[in-house]
Amino acid sequence: MQAAIEAALAELTLGPEISPDDAPAIASWLARHELSGADAVALTRDFARLQLYRKLVRGNLHGAIEATIPRTVARLGAAFTPHFDEFLRASPPRTHYLRDLTPSFLQFALPRWAGDASVPEYLADLARHEALQVEVASLLARPAQHVPAELSLEQGVEFIDATRLVHYSWAVHRLPEAEASRELPEQAAVCLLVYRSPEHEVRYLELGPFAAALLAGLLSQRLGLQVALNQAAQLAALPLDDELLTRAALLLADLAERGTLLGKSPQVTEKTSKLSPQTGNPA
């Protein structure tokens, strides 16, 4: 019986609103969960109080999402509410942690926004960008006193946990931070390295094609440095000559200075050689 009561309360909280004056709707709600007798009487008697509970829970959930993606919610305006309501009804959150709520909402909403002409195309990228900032901010930064280890071509490169490589179709990272802004982003393919600095700030580095390909190999594919260099050069249609190797070394040195690169990974491949990061500008 406890399970039936919990299911009824979940529907009341997350499903379509039932008016306290709609006796047939209340009766149908109780019948759906096979509640009768003293339980039905108690729930009916306390229905107005349960409606207040519904309002508080939904307000907390709405507020948690709005705090994470405020500019997205502001740009949607009143149109956000139907998406929020449908999320709670069709794919209610399974977690007790509010930090996991927005990723669940976006997993539900983004495919639907893609097919909704009333939602601006760039909004999915903006929502992902805002949510990513909160995610990265919650992860550990590099200790301030850490000294990056020398790199080796036959081994991979180790990054801090608070590092993400993302691709957008719109330059949403250049939009103003003000929630009231309605400036439109430029439509452009963008690759960003997002990381938490030793000063505990979330920072962004926009990458060119070669740098993006190199970091994709190192971060996403966990390739050895030599293999990642070869792959990145091919993808960027550039010769892997001394000039490109210098650009790569400068990029890796810059990432070490920024606090996102820790040094070589413990994974070893076949050939042995070494590449030491040197200071300079990123590729």
Where does each model-flagged region fall?
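Long, charge-rich, low-complexity alpha-helical segments
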Residues: 1-149, 200, 205-283
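Low-complexity, glycine/alanine/valine/leucine- and proline-rich hydrophobic stretches
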Residues: 159-220
